[in-house]
């Protein structure tokens, strides 16, 4: 998560920024952000059990359940969305990520990680390009990052901005 948090910090120097931690899990990313001085963090996750653990950290403004493969309703209130450990082997994911754009203020960015094995196995880069052409967004950065280091699986870090409407 550190590479994604570092990227988000470079994009958002203001600690007053409002951030959505999509797929917040137990709250590890939120805690890293909180420790850097960000205090306006909301979290969404698929698992009620994970959300309970995130709630116990007492760092999120709000927490809620959301499934990115279903419909996700977001208001455009976020300066950034960070999504760590969510994207991997599912061919719909490069298309699902555009659902998060609804939560972004104009000019805001999505910072996401992708499991490197999934990136390779389903040819994420090609699918991401198809999604970009279909939905209109700018991939500002794709970089290699450590991911599941104990399993020796690398990852990708993406910085994406929707095109202005």
Describe the predicted segments one by one.
Residues 95-106:
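A short glycine-rich, Lys/Arg-flanked "PGG" loop and its adjoining helix->strand segment in the class I
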Residues 1-15:
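Conserved alpha-helix/loop element of class I SAM-dependent methyltransferases that forms part
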Residues 20-71:
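Class I SAM-dependent methyltransferase SAM/SAH-binding core
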Residues 107-115:
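Conserved beta-strand signature within the Rossmann-like core of class I S-adenosyl-L-methionine
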Residues 148-165:
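Core SAM-dependent methyltransferase catalytic element
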Residues 80-93:
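A short SAM/SAH-binding and catalytic strip from SAM-dependent methyltransferases
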Residues 72-81:
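A short acidic, Gly/Pro-enriched loop at the edge of an enzyme's catalytic core
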Residues 123-143:
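Conserved Class I S-adenosyl-L-methionine
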């Amino acid at each position: 998560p550190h590479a994604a948090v570092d990227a988000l910090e470079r994009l958002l120097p203001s600690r007053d920024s409002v951030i959505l931690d999509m797929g917040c899990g137990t709250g590890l990313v939120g805690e890293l952000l909180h420790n850097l001085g960000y205090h306006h963090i909301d979290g969404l996750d698929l698992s009620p059990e994970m959300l309970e653990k995130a709630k116990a950290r007492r760092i999120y403004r709000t927490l809620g359940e959301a499934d990115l493969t279903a419909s996700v309703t977001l208001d455009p209130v976020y300066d950034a969305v960070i999504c760590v450990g969510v994207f991997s082997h599912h061919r719909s994911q490069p298309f699902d990520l555009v659902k998060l754009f609804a939560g972004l203020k104009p000019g805001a960015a999505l910072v996401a990680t992708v499991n490197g094995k999934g990136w390779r196995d389903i040819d994420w880069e090609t699918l991401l390009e198809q999604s970009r052409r279909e939905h209109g967004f700018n991939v500002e950065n794709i970089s290699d990052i450590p991911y599941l280091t104990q399993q020796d699986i690398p990852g990708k870090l993406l910085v994406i901005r929707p095109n202005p409407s």
